[in-house]
C-alpha cells in the first residue's frame, strides 16, 4: 500500500486480533530501501501457543508500504507462500516518482511479474477486485501472461458478489508453479 495511514490501521487491526484471541506474537517494524525508495514494513510473527512460539513453529504476516512492483525485490531472500491483495476500486494509481498515472491494466502488467517472483514455487496470489472497474477476463489474461497458473475450478470459481452500487467484488486465486 502507498498510504501510510492504511498500513498503520491494518497493522493495528491485526495486532488487536492477535491480542483478542490470545495468540503469542511479536511485532517488528523496520524499513528497507528499494530502488532509492524507503519501504516501511510491519512484520508480525505469531503462533497459536506459547510452546509453539518458543519452538519457532510460527507464521509471519508482512505489511509493506510502497510500490507493489518492488515486492519481488522485497521478498527475494524470503519468498512468500501467499500474497493477498484487495485491489483499489477505481481510483487513480499514480506512481510515487511523480510521473503520469498508469492505467489499471498497465499497472498490473508491470507489477504482476514481480508478484510471481515474490512467491515460492507452489505459492499463490489471492486477489479481490471490483468487476465494474476491472473485468475478470482482463485480470485472468494479465495473470496468465505474467506466468501464473489460474485456479478456475470449484471452489475457486464462484466468489462474485454485490457490495454496493459502485462495487461488485470478485476474487481470483493464481499459483506460481515456476521455480
Predicted ranges, named:
Residues 1-179:
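Class I S-adenosyl-L-methionine-dependent methyltransferase catalytic core
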